[in-house]
Amino acid sequence: MRHSLDDISDAEADEIFAEMQKTALNGVFEWITLVFQVDGVSRAFTHQAVRHRVGFSYSQESMRFTKVEDMDAICGPSVKTDEQKALWNDTMKSVEDAYHKLIDAGVETQDARGVLPTNVVTRIGIGTNYRALVGLAGDRLCLQAQGEWREVIRQMKEEVRRVWGDDFADYLQPVCEHEHRCKFESVFDRPCPLQKKWNR
């Protein structure tokens, strides 16, 4: 009888993990608990994150009680030209000015926050289990997902790799890599260059 995980060699751990991947009974993955502090993401990202409800817990930075001193907002990759960037920056400056003027005029932060953009930068704590994280990665590593997601999952994978090694990290893949088919084929889904790989 083993009394500690330290009694399991790396080779045995690899063998156990390989067997775990061969079964649809993934309940054992739910015993692995992870907590991430995710900084520098947009509230658009966190609005999507909290839709993943089963197997997740969240604690988000409040904009109701916390005054935003220096507003930072994430500019999406499709804002490319100088004209577009200038319009974006001017708009963000106007919004930030309006927010602080409302606060200075006596408006409570919970009401003044209404003028802030969806892409304002925030932070969120995410607690989950490994099984739920595999599902999250499956959905959000898809090329149809917002690019911000792929970067966050990439960093999560590197943390998993640092603590538990390559096997656990590399198992965090787009759902099509696990199921060998695309699961995003509705009329409202965006085309993906990998669909042709699976849908032949």
Model-inferred region functions:
Residues 1-200:
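Family-specific signature for flavin-dependent thymidylate synthase
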